[in-house]
Every structure is written in structure tokens, then in C-alpha cells.
């Protein structure tokens, strides 16, 4: 049985769907879900194959987006963190009428480094794929440690992420592998030039996975979008800076 796990909280007049990153699940939002559900009708989702959304194998980005969309409200602000940012972006591209605003958090339209494009070296992503088959729990933990490195609260932030992972059964190796394949191969830089809904991009200055150098490059490529950098955050600004993060979303709600 392959059902998407979906939880709805709050009764705000605007729907907000939160999509988590690679290796994780919707429990990662527990640090902000109370605050956000007082302003929005909040939707917490486990991506296909992750957390409680069992019974899925490795999916393409397009299939992942379609699977999530099946249970979604007619119209919502879609927020995606990291890998989830690609899923939210894909939904904005294929079903713009369902997307009131697009928010990407510590996400890149092209995670993999390319010619004159900063990102994760492809051999690093390939290395993670290789290590998954050897010791996938340790590989996921290494990936999580990378996400909080450099912040003042790095240790406790990493603990919060690890707790999220361990709270639920680990995803299957092929699901994790499929997620890494998306990070390694997808490039939405050009397609996202054409989205017309409000588009907010949030970054961490200390992020080791999405280099801050991409921010001005995307400002130029997508002049209709807005960007904001959390000065002391790494890859998970909603964990290190929850109050500031929520304020940004409440401010966006006033504008849509």
C-alpha cells in the first residue's frame, strides 16, 4: 500500500504545505509547527518513501511531485526545504494554478556543481550513494552533520535532526538513493525563470550544501523572485532561527 502520510493542523485562511529534505520526515518541522499553525492551515507531509509514507520505491522528481499533489489542498503556499524545494518547484512548474506562492529553503535548482555553477561536487554525491549500500545509517548521519556545521548551535541542531531521523523507521536504501539521484541530476534553473507566482528563496549564510554564491546568480536569473539569507544559519535555518523563519512566512502571507 503506498499512501502519503499527511497531517493537517490549524485553521488559517491560507494553506501552507511543508516538504522536508533528503533522509528526513515531517517531524523535522516540530520546532515551528505550533507557531505556523496559529497563522495557517498547516500541512505536514512525509515525502514518498520517507517517514510514514511507506510502500514507494525510488521515484523521479516528477513522480514524487504528482504523488504529493494527490492529497494536497486546491491552493496553497508550497514550502520545500533542500530536496523538498525541488519537489515544491516541480509542482509550481507543472501545476501553477495550485500554488499561491513558492518558498524554497536552503535549496538549489541545481544541487550538483556544474561549469561556472557552485554546488556539491558530483563525486561527493556519488560517494554518498556508494556508502549508502555499505552503512546507510552512518551515511545519513554524516549528511545531517554537514547540514548544521558552522552554526553557533551546530551540536544541538544536529541532535535535533538526528532525533527526527531516528523517530521513525529508516527509509529504504533505494528511496535514499533515488533522492540522491534527483539531487545529482536535476537542473531547474531555466524552467523556474517562467514561474509567475510570488517566489521567496531562503538561505543560510553558512550552508555547506547550497553555497551562498548561488544567491546573487539566481537573483539575476529570476528577477521576479525574492531572496533572504539568514546570517548565522547553515542548511536548516528553521531549526537555528525558528522565530525569524516564521516571521518571514507570516509576512509573505500578508502579500499573497
UniProtKB/Swiss-Prot annotation:
Subunit structure: Monomer.
Chain coiled-coil ranges: none
MF (Gene Ontology): pimelyl-[acyl-carrier protein] methyl ester esterase activity
BP terms from Gene Ontology: biotin biosynthetic process
Pathway given in the UniProt record: Cofactor biosynthesis; biotin biosynthesis
EC number: 3.1.1.85
Subcellular location, record wording: Cytoplasm
Pfam family, one: Abhydrolase_1
Species of provenance: Escherichia coli O17:K52:H18 (strain UMN026 / ExPEC)
Active site: 82, 207, 235
Gene: bioH
Keywords linked to the UniProt accession: Biotin biosynthesis, Cytoplasm, Hydrolase, Serine esterase
GO cellular component: cytoplasm
AB hydrolase-1 domain residues: 15-242
Reaction equations catalysed: 6-carboxyhexanoyl-[ACP] methyl ester + H2O = 6-carboxyhexanoyl-[ACP] + methanol + H(+)
Name listed for the protein in its UniProt record: Pimeloyl-[acyl-carrier protein] methyl ester esterase
Record-stated family: Belongs to the AB hydrolase superfamily. Carboxylesterase BioH family.
Function: The physiological role of BioH is to remove the methyl group introduced by BioC when the pimeloyl moiety is complete. It allows to synthesize pimeloyl-ACP via the fatty acid synthetic pathway through the hydrolysis of the ester bonds of pimeloyl-ACP esters.
NCBIfam families per record: bioH, PRK10349.1
InterPro entries linked to this entry: AB_hydrolase_1, AB_hydrolase_fold, BioH, Carboxylesterase_BioH
Binding sites annotated in the UniProt record for substrate: 22, 82-83, 143-147, 235
Top EC class, one word: hydrolase
Keyword Hydrolase listed: yes
